[in-house]
From Swiss-Prot:
Binding of Mg(2+), residues: 97
EC annotation from Swiss-Prot or TrEMBL: 2.7.7.77
A GO cellular component entry from the record: cytoplasm
Pfam families registered for this protein in UniProt: NTP_transf_3
Residues the record lists as binding GTP: 6-8, 18, 65, 97
Keywords carried by this UniProt record: Cytoplasm, GTP-binding, Magnesium, Metal-binding, Molybdenum cofactor biosynthesis, Nucleotide-binding, Transferase
Species of the source: Staphylococcus carnosus (strain TM300)
InterPro entries according to UniProt: MobA-like_NTP_Trfase, Molybde_CF_guanTrfase, Nucleotide-diphossugar_trans
Main location: cytoplasm
Cofactor(s) needed for function: Mg(2+)
GO molecular function terms listed in the Swiss-Prot or TrEMBL record: GTP binding; metal ion binding; molybdenum cofactor guanylyltransferase activity
The name this protein goes by in its record: Probable molybdenum cofactor guanylyltransferase
UniProt catalytic activity: Mo-molybdopterin + GTP + H(+) = Mo-molybdopterin guanine dinucleotide + diphosphate
Domain notes: The N-terminal domain determines nucleotide recognition and specific binding, while the C-terminal domain determines the specific binding to the target protein.
Length: 197
């Protein structure tokens, strides 16, 4: 099983590449790698990024977004990795702007996926907050690849376009016994400052 850290966004709202922002003395991407490594669950951690940032990452393989689909958001990153590593039975996808992710949350989501993958033939299992799916903290089956490819060819390359066309299910973030905001995106500098307090 492989993990994909999505780190190719423009970070316009944040003002600088979020992957290299720091929390607790580690860059966001390093923090996520540390959590993923600690689980002994993934045989490879891959960073999906763009040509500009690719050489800046250390400690993980980097796959640059496919040239024909660059600048098409998270789907482009997932597609670019899946296309090269189609043999993997499952991919865990995490956005780099979610640096507070915990091993406990990932383990619980994995258990949910395993329990439902055969009976419900799930292709995507992720978290949701209330009624809002969080497709950038989710497990994806390689069966999603053709649907992602079609979405990227269309003029709607939103994550919703994919998960509404696949067998997907979501568990609420409140089901994880953890009172931190481990699932929160850091979109603005003030988001990071509020976490550091």
């Amino acid at each position: 099983m492989k993990a994909i850290i999505l780190a190719g966004g423009q970070s316009e709202r944040f003002g600088a590449p979020k992957a290299f922002a720091e929390i607790d003395g580690k860059m966001f991407y390093e923090q996520i790698i540390t959590v993923l490594d600690s689980m002994n669950m993934f045989n490879e951690i891959i960073i999906s990024s763009n040509e500009t940032l690719a050489s800046e990452f250390k400690g993980a393989r980097v796959i640059v977004d496919d040239s024909e689909h660059k600048n098409k958001g998270p789907l482009s990153g997932i597609y670019s990795v899946m296309k090269q590593d189609f043999e993997s039975e499952l991919f865990f996808v995490i956005s780099v702007d979610t640096p507070l992710i915990t091993a406990k949350a990932i383990s619980q989501l994995y258990q949910f996926m395993v329990e439902h993958v055969i009976e419900d033939q799930l292709d995507i299992a992720g978290f949701k907050e209330g009624n809002h799916p969080i497709p950038t903290i989710a497990f994806y089956s390689p069966n999603c690849l053709p649907i992602i490819a079609r979405a990227l060819e269309s003029d709607d390359y939103s994550m919703r376009h994919v998960y509404q066309q696949t067998a997907s299910d979501w568990i609420d973030v409140s089901s994880v016994d953890d009172d931190t905001e481990w699932y929160k995106n850091i979109n603005y500098p003030q988001d990071l400052e509020s976490i550091k307090k």
